[in-house]
UniProtKB/Swiss-Prot annotation:
Entry-linked InterPro entries: K+_transporter, K_trans_C, K_trans_N, Kup
Molecular function in Gene Ontology: potassium ion transmembrane transporter activity; symporter activity
Bilayer-spanning residue ranges: 10-30, 47-67, 104-124, 140-160, 172-192, 214-234, 250-270, 283-303, 347-367, 369-389, 396-416, 422-442
Location of the protein in the cell: Cell inner membrane
Membrane topology according to the record: Multi-pass membrane protein
Protein name (record): Probable potassium transport system protein Kup 2
Catalytic reaction list: K(+)(in) + H(+)(in) = K(+)(out) + H(+)(out)
Keyword terms: Cell inner membrane, Cell membrane, Ion transport, Membrane, Potassium, Potassium transport, Symport, Transmembrane, Transmembrane helix, Transport
Family label: Belongs to the HAK/KUP transporter (TC 2.A.72) family.
Species this protein is from: Albidiferax ferrireducens (strain ATCC BAA-621 / DSM 15236 / T118) (Rhodoferax ferrireducens)
Length: 625
């Protein structure tokens, strides 16, 4: 590829990263400064404290985003992929020398993933509300319309998800680029009028601000953390855009624009303290307010879209890793496999977001709910990164501590500060995360118990089919594919077929699908074929947690290993377990009941593995756990 085309590709990816990766953190100026100096924090609104607060925001962006994420954590990729799931797999594989340590690391990662859903609810709610609240600055008469308009925008956003984002997605980058340009221009205009705010670039002013607050510092930091929300997207979307475009976008445009706008708002408040009612929109001349509201609403919708898409991707990964039951996945783009739509996730998210909007009623009230889930995820990310640096990259313990200790201390400060807002709304995303964590843990444990029971009750495969080949059993043409969780025991569907139909197919494939804790499995590693006895083969299909399962396509790959399967003459036999909860088993009875409900409502195996419906025979089996 030529140097020119390389530059063009890098520019396109950098522009795309602006639209998807930086939408959330890029819309934080809408509400952060207003919350830092709200009556709830008790921070005086004067020049010294304005310079100090802006200094904390600026150096927080430098420490949390630039040093921690852009320079350190983006290096911890799992075969090019990022995100809490990929990092968890990386840390668990590197540091999981004992089963106990591996389990602890996996639980940390799963809890961090569960907390992400709390962020997925709060981000669209607070972003859209804060943008539409700009109408109140245009005229107070619009105040009563803010909530209905916000609800309408959110319903519209979730309603169009099933059509995909391939068309409007091309506009995300340019719109967000315009947004950051506007942030810069409006900020510079105020800085010129009040250049004293540039003292915020001195880190000593940040330390002095925190020192002067005493124990009250935690309350102030709990509001300042709003400037860092959305930072996890830098790492989560690394697989889509690559490390370099994300770094270039941050250092080249996003960081300067955010720093300039926060200093601009600080300069405005130094000059006119009455602007605290909505310092972001007061940066604009009256004639530009309506266009500013429209642009802000577009930017927040884009930020929300990125979080919603992230929720789909996270859920799909959790399903493939065995943390959630199967769900319907619709691919909305013929070109981009990462563009998916999950109806159940979409509507559950919409209901949760609307409850948050109506329940809290304003962006200021929602600001209290924002932060706990985000900062706890940041803390978990740093802790997992320590194990990657120490055990994955092989650095000595002092080096690993030097690379992560400061960030661990900083993240702990942010978590403690946000915890003070627990009773003001911080409980909402935390409870949501705990519920999802419980669901994930219950599903994982339930599947383990289910497979153990099946393994205990069913006969071993090889002796069974060896004896079967010696019997005179009526054989019918075609190939039968039996999907099983445990490849060493006889499939329930095979025993049902023999018992009720008293026939055996000429060719029988015992198929096991294994999902590995790596993002991708290449085609040359996708299938493993093992002949058993005449007429029987064992096939293992391997997928990563970002692959799209497609069994018919995988079976075509068996030909390279000596097994030719005519897909037009193949029947797929599936066993559907009907779970019966019993007291005194491996889980609390309420968890067994929850698992039974999830198992009963899990998505179709045929749809999940893309099996042709007219070639599928599904047989039910009652299993006690």
């Amino acid at each position: 590829m030529s140097r020119t085309s390389n530059r063009e590709s890098l520019a396109a990816l950098t522009l795309g990263a602006m639209g998807v990766v930086y939408g959330d953190i890029g819309t934080s100026p809408l509400y952060t400064m207003k919350e830092v100096f709200s009556p709830a924090t008790g921070v005086p609104l004067d020049g010294v404290h304005l310079i100090g607060a802006v200094s904390v925001i600026f150096w927080g962006l430098m420490m949390v985003v630039t040093l921690k994420y852009v320079l350190l954590i983006l290096r911890a990729d799992n075969r090019g992929e990022g995100g809490i799931m990929a990092l968890t797999a990386l840390a668990a594989n590197a540091a999981g020398k004992t089963a106990r340590r591996r389990t602890v690391l996996l639980l940390m990662g799963v809890f961090g993933a569960a907390l992400f859903y709390g962020d997925s609810v709060i981000t669209p709610a607070i972003s859209v509300l804060s943008a539409v609240e700009g109408l109140e600055v245009v005229t107070p008469a619009f105040k009563s319309y803010v909530l209905p308009i916000s609800v309408t925008v959110l319903i519209g956003l979730f309603a169009v998800q099933r059509f995909g984002t391939s068309l409007v997605g091309k506009l995300f980058g340019p719109v967000i680029m315009l947004w950051f340009a506007v942030l810069s221009v409006t900020g510079v205009a105020e800085i010129i009028q009040q250049p004293a705010i540039l003292a915020a670039l001195n880190p000593l002013n940040a330390f002095e601000f925190l020192r002067s607050q005493g124990w009250h510092m935690f309350v102030a930091v709990g509001a300042i953390v709003l400037a860092f929300t959305g930072v996890e997207a830098l790492y989560a979307d690394m697989g889509h855009f690559g490390k370099r475009p994300i770094q270039l976008a941050w250092l080249g445009l996003v960081l300067p624009a955010l720093a300039i706008n926060y200093m601009g708002q600080g300069a405005l408040l130094m000059r006119d303290p009455s602007a605290l009612a909505n310092p972001f929109y007061r940066l604009f001349p009256q004639a530009w307010l309506m266009p500013a509201v429209v642009l802000a609403t577009l930017a927040t919708v884009i930020a929300s879209q990125a979080v919603i898409s992230g929720a789909y991707s996270m859920t799909k990964q959790a399903v493939l890793l065995g943390l959630l039951p199967r769900m319907q996945v619709q691919y909305t783009s013929a070109k981009e496999i990462g563009q998916i739509y999950m109806p159940e996730v979409n509507w559950l998210l919409l209901i949760s977001v609307l409850l948050a909007v109506v329940g809290f009623g304003s962006s200021s009230a929602l600001a209290s709910a924002y932060g706990i889930a985000v900062t706890m995820t940041m803390l978990i990310t740093t802790a997992l990164t320590f194990f990657v640096v120490r055990d994955g990259w092989g650095y000595p313990l002092p080096v690993a501590l030097a690379a992560t200790a400061v960030f661990l201390a900083l993240d702990t400060l942010l978590v403690v500060s946000c915890s003070l807002k627990f009773f003001q709304g911080g409980w909402f995303p935390l409870v949501l995360g705990l519920v999802i964590f419980t669901v994930m843990a219950t599903w994982r444990r339930g599947r383990e118990l289910l497979i153990d029971n099946i393994r205990h009750d069913d006969p071993e495969l090889l002796p069974f089919i060896t004896a079967l080949s010696a019997d005179v059993v009526h054989r019918v043409p075609r190939t039968a594919v039996y999907t099983v969780a445990n490849p060493d025991t006889v499939p329930q569907a095979l025993m049902h077929n023999l018992k009720h139909n008293q026939v055996l197919h000429e060719r029988n494939v015992i198929l096991t699908v294994v999902f590995h804790d790596v993002p991708w499995i290449a085609f040359d590693e996708r299938v493993q074929v093992k002949p058993l006895v005449p007429g029987f083969w064992k096939v293992q299909v391997n997928y990563g947690f970002k692959n799209a399962p497609d069994i018919p396509r995988a079976l075509e790959l068996c030909q390279s290993q000596g097994l030719s399967i005519n897909l037009f003459e193949t029947s797929y036999f599936l066993s559907r377990e009907i779970v019966v909860p019993t007291k005194g088993a491996g889980m609390a009875h309420w968890r067994e009941a929850l698992f039974a409900i999830m198992s009963r409502n899990a998505g179709s195996v045929a749809d999940f593995f893309r099996l042709p419906n007219n070639c599928v025979i599904e047989l039910g089996t009652r299993v006690q756990i």
